């Protein structure tokens, strides 16, 4: 009897010690979380309420024709840090956090994922630009931001004067042409769409290396690696595999009206698996583009080259 009591006491105390250690690590991690980075030089930060009931965080700077920059996953507007200030020398640049990312709202997903549809996310950004007085503007979107940008050109054709899509082909094309090579290149497209919590658990792997993270990675993790951030990213992908496909199927006969420039990683999966220009020329009337150095996140990997391409296209 004494041995049994002693064993129970030991187990109880061990449990308390483990719980205390976990809580201590959680508190330490929270205390060690980096503060938000300041806006780019010459930019100001804004938090803009939208018609969709969320608040979108954005930075704005420069002067000239308006230009909206949209990031991918799991990044934030900070991904444009080496490009936006230089574009601001000739454009009024707005770099925004998408719904669910960075310092924008991270709402709980609805059962049909509609509040993370690209339609809802595009409307957020239309509201942001209108809040600054811009009814028409040029648009650059990379990765998930490119998918929001694609939907924006269809839902708001009069608002977008020119569009640049970076390292994507249309979502509908990808999901209707699934191959083993696609699954191997983009496993997260299938992992993150799994019901909670499986998808959210998979999202942990997208946060970058645990050891010696860069300042940019720390900034992306600050909000995107929280439980709410991981859920939001999964909802973005769940919407892409459900309600976004419904919207895209309804618009298969429509073409993007504005000029489109497509940039993709010359050494990446898009170049290896797809005829990127041919696919986009089925979806838009006026398409140019080329393979680029710098990888999938070329705005970080080759900012000078990306800047030159954006300037050439947007100035014309």
PLM feature spans:
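Hydrophobic "lid"/C-terminal helical patch
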Residues: 14, 125, 306, 310
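Conserved HGGG/HGGXW glycine-rich cap/lid loop of the alpha/beta-hydrolase fold
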Residues: 60-106
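Short, well-ordered alpha-helices that flank and scaffold nucleotide-derived cofactor binding pockets
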Residues: 82-85, 89, 154-155, 308, ...
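Active-site helix-initiating loop/hinge in glycosyltransferases
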Residues: 72, 301-302
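An N-terminal hydrophobic leader/cap segment in hydrolases
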Residues: 13-46
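Flexible "cap/lid" subdomain of the alpha/beta-hydrolase fold that forms the substrate-access gate
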Residues: 32-45, 54-56, 63-66, 94, ...
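N-terminal secretory signal peptides and thylakoid transit peptides that target proteins
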Residues: 2-18
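Structural motif
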Residues: 50-51
